[in-house]
Amino acid sequence: MIAPLRVGFVTGATPDKWARSWRAGRRESLHLVPVTEADQLDGVRDGSLDMAIVRLPVDRDGLHCVRLYDEVQVAVASREHLLAAADEEVTTADLVDEQLVRPHSSGWRPTAEQLEWPPMSEQDAIETVAAGTGVVILPMSVARLHQRKDVVRRVVSDLDPTTIALVWRTERDDDVTQAFVGVTKGRTPNTSR
């Protein structure tokens, strides 16, 4: 029996189109495994995953890394928040007086003194802002995943997008691995690298 290819995917990543393409053209089965952003490299490093679709930045030491796509960042707030009146886009200047209920991954902080919030998941952060307390900035895909009727999201146009990438250990560079890389890059059985 051929061993399955085990691929982790970080919260919000969308591996479905690649999984469909893989299953249509390969004998090896594909096992998709959800991983959190905090633990996104653990399975690749310990060998329980062959590859992972991750959100950069990550420690790339000992890993191959192929960029897949970028995601815009969005501010999420209660429907009752002033942000709800804004157009589809805001800038960080529009957010300088806000309380971030979760630190932003880029390190950007509003100029307003920030309260000490306990660590919380993306879902917990959205529940907190839905209650009318503060704002959270997340990748669009994560905000969509946890969408609620009582929150709004606005693109933060001057924050760099986050990047989704495929990573795998440098010593694992076999045909199956390269075939999956090819699938993520749009290659078909009739094309080559």
For the regions a protein language model found, what residue spans apply to each?
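Short, well-ordered beta-strand segments
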Residues: 4-10, 52, 76, 101, ...
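Short beta-strand and adjacent tight-turn residues that come in two discontinuous sequence segments
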Residues: 35, 49-55, 120, 137-139
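A late-sequence structural motif
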Residues: 17, 154-193
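Short alpha-helix C-terminal cap/hinge motif
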Residues: 1-34, 42
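Short helix-initiation/N-cap motifs at beta->coil->alpha
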Residues: 33-42, 118-125
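Short beta-strand-centered segments that line the small-molecule binding cleft or hinge
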Residues: 18-22, 38-73, 86, 150-154
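C-terminal regulatory
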Residues: 25, 65-72, 76-133, 142-159, ...
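Alpha-helix/helix-capping structural signal
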Residues: 13, 140-141
